[in-house]
């Protein structure tokens, strides 16, 4: 399906989309003017605040010493190693959907150039997230294990079910843009979390700390992504009629039920062999409620933070912690002190002033 990088167009043409072969790309309409983005005139200050937050917390996986977790990894039995590897395989697939299709779809409904800039940032970081899992794989797993994990993620029924449901929402040009935002928030704030449980659990037991540090950095990003896109959904929903708003809410809860039914099966597949299934289901129901809250809606499930394994809840905190940059990068970075330049900074004196340039040294 991925041919010469044209993943988006290939999906449109494939049977995954269901009959999209007959679709035609929109006729090209040339523009007569292109305007520069002006960050000094921002119509929605949430765009500016989100941009600043995202750029402030920029990170890369290569700065985190995952190899330091090898001793912990060797202590895990085969069942737990299988769960860790396949959890990250699933997360890689979902982040691939987000980076390649999700943000592209959302950018079709932007209202300002600043919103486009924020979504560009989010799209890049989703690619960083997807690449981060490969860093983990290359450190902890053998080449044969990595190959098996990716073959599994590309074919596993329940994982593919949720990836395809979300991708089809993104790729359908006739789909309501607000529904695409709902799908995005459900993926960001709900569906990822069956995978996030594992590294947070190990972090709470002081295991795989550097792997978990990557996940905490991803969690910190996803927290901002889900909140921002949920806000944009709420802004758009306010422009709809009362009936349209109710229809959207009815659809939203039905879609969540549909996703949760599949997520239950996926969770059993991943966690039954290690005995964590019930705890993970509580965790994902709690995060489904968080997704609804990001969209301005009431919770669906009775589960609250107090019902979640406290070891995992402690790890899910996205508050910033600093580490020495040259030993281990944490989910907060110490930045060098800077000051604004002024005219005197450009007052460079001639080093030869007052000297006879013809004189020998």
Which role does the model predict for each range below?
Residues 8, 12, 16-361:
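Non-heme di-metal
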